[in-house]
Regions:
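Short capping segments at the starts of secondary-structure elements
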Residues: 14-16, 104-112, 187-190
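A contiguous, low-structure linker/loop signature
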Residues: 40-99
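Non-catalytic regulatory appendages
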Residues: 212, 216-267
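Glycine-rich, small/acidic residue-mixed loop/short-helix segments
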Residues: 265, 271-332
Length: 332
């Protein structure tokens, strides 16, 4: 069974969809791609734009209150970008696109972006890549569409209200508290700045969210910053598994504004680029030490790796165990 109590972020790049599934699967007791694909296909996990906004995986029961927290901020950012580039879309055009989406997706249909574009063109709407991206992004943050059933490797859209059963509406304070709890339960120790970066919340709202769950948090001063630890987090005990293959855009890196505790700044470029592309990395005893990728040979699935930390020597047995876990995930 898969239960998401948080969201994960990812970007839409070539081969990223397998990495997205691995990000969930590697955290399961029995990793298997079929279980993750089933959850995505059935709508237990949704892949949509929310928070910062980039692509995220969201538990279905969390989607509405998360959209309520971030929708206006995302719309303002998108509108500001469009205005600055002379590419504004009118509210009438957005309304028209929403009407068409309601008609063509009604009846629990799932359609790809290209299929939707063909319907838009027939309805007199502009359907080039720019307009489609804006139309679909607005429909997502308005809570009209979300990810649909899996069509092979192609992302699809479906009507949110047909895909996700009704859920109790939360107040803004309840939503802020729930988001803060989810973050610090899974990312602690972390700072206010980390939480603000991850959530997309302004510092004032991020600070309010932390104050709402203050009884659940411990705070420690270290390196001139306040670090928060959720009371559900283990602070002692033996960690299992010294080496992990982290997918691109994994929460271990992207979930924090400051990553220097696990990755020296001089190695940043080996893990991610200045324009926000994150690579698959090797995690050894809590530190990022190298890269890995799928095998270069077509029929080979055993991953390849390279180290950029020259002071680290990894045992072959340890590497093989980590790689075999990934291979088992792909084949189960």
């Amino acid at each position: 069974e898969i239960r998401l109590s948080l969201v994960g972020s990812e970007m839409c790049i070539r081969d990223s969809y397998t990495m997205v599934k691995w990000a969930v699967g590697m955290r399961l007791k029995s990793p298997g791609i079929q279980a993750v694909e089933k959850a995505l296909h059935q709508g237990e996990i949704l892949r949509t734009h929310v928070m910062r906004p980039t692509w995220h995986l969201v538990a279905a029961e969390d989607i509405r209150w998360m959209l309520k927290l971030s929708a206006q901020r995302i719309k303002s950012a998108n509108d500001s970008y469009a205005k600055g580039h002379g590419l504004e879309i009118t509210e009438q055009q957005y309304d028209r696109s929403h009407t068409v989406l309601g008609n063509i997706l009604s009846g629990k249909r799932s359609l790809t972006k290209q299929e939707i574009a063909e319907h838009f063109e027939r309805s007199g709407l502009l359907a080039d890549n720019y307009h489609m991206t804006r139309f679909m992004s607005r429909a997502e943050v308005e809570g009209i569409v979300c990810s649909g059933e899996c069509h092979g490797r192609q992302h699809t859209y479906a009507l949110l209200d047909e895909r996700v059963p009704p859920t109790p509406e939360l107040t803004k304070e309840e939503a802020l508290a729930r988001l803060a709890t989810a973050y610090f339960r899974s990312h602690a120790p972390a700072t206010l700045q980390d939480f603000s970066w991850w959530s997309g919340l302004p510092l004032t709202e991020a600070r309010q969210a932390i104050s709402l769950i203050e009884p659940e948090l411990m705070s420690e001063q270290w390196n001139s910053q306040t670090w928060y630890i959720h009371d559900s987090c283990r602070t002692s005990g033996k960690a299992t598994g010294n080496l992990h293959l982290l997918p691109s855009y994994d929460e271990y890196l992207i979930g924090y504004k400051d990553r220097t505790d696990v990755l020296p700044k001089e190695d940043y470029s080996k893990a991610f680029t200045n324009n926000g592309l994150f690579f698959p990395v090797l995690l050894y005893k809590g530190h990022v030490v190298g890269n890995w990728n799928k095998a270069s040979k077509k029929k080979e699935i055993f991953p390849e790796h390279s180290l950029f930390r020259k002071d680290i020597c990894l045992k072959e047995e340890l590497l093989n165990q980590a790689k075999e876990k990934y291979v088992r995930f792909l084949t189960h």
